[in-house]
Amino acid sequence: MRQLNDSFNMMIRGAVTKGRYWELRQGASLLIASDALVRAVKLEKSVGVPAVVVADDIEVPDRYWIGRFAQGLMATPVLHFRDRNIVNPFNVAWYRSAGTRATQLMAASPRHKDKYLWFLALHQAVGENRELVPPAVLSRLISEGIIKWTPQQPES
């Protein structure tokens, strides 16, 4: 069982891009040529953090940002963190253990500490219920009356 568990000692990263795509199937073989795939690999490498990053030229529809406020951070598919739109790596079932696991992996692999610290900062931001919406989008949604900002009331 240890060998199986050791195979899951990783963080996932990737990228969402758009571009031309072509494929050819020949029996059991598949040949793919894709601008989007090449761009995704380059973007993933350049960002260098454990996240699935959405390319800057992909416009995320407002409904995803609005959903963050309607259903909460665990239910929204996309987050904005440190100037990047990313696929939300968290859900209700695995949120808490994701932070614990990242901390364990960081202790086991200190040479990758910066990547784990990035992930743990994202984990903390979600736990603190930060907006995690691009500032310009948040301002526009508020100014258009789509969402309303209300200051947090002190607990009594």
Regions found by a protein language model. Give the residues of each.
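Short glycine-/polar-rich loops that comprise or flank the Walker A/P-loop
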Residues: 10-12, 47-50
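Amphipathic alpha-helical regulatory segments at dimerization interfaces
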Residues: 3-4, 42-46
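Intrinsically disordered, glycine/charged-rich C-terminal tails and inter-domain linkers
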Residues: 49-50, 54-156
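Catalytic core of nucleotidyl cyclases, primarily class III adenylyl/guanylyl cyclases
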Residues: 3-35
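Residues that flank catalytic or metal-binding motifs in active/ligand-binding sites
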Residues: 17, 39, 48
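Short, surface-exposed, charged loop/turn segments at secondary-structure junctions
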Residues: 28-39, 64-73
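Glycine-rich loops and low-complexity Gly/Arg-rich segments
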Residues: 37-42, 78
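Generic structural hydrophobic/aromatic packing signal, biased to beta-strands
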Residues: 16, 43, 52-54
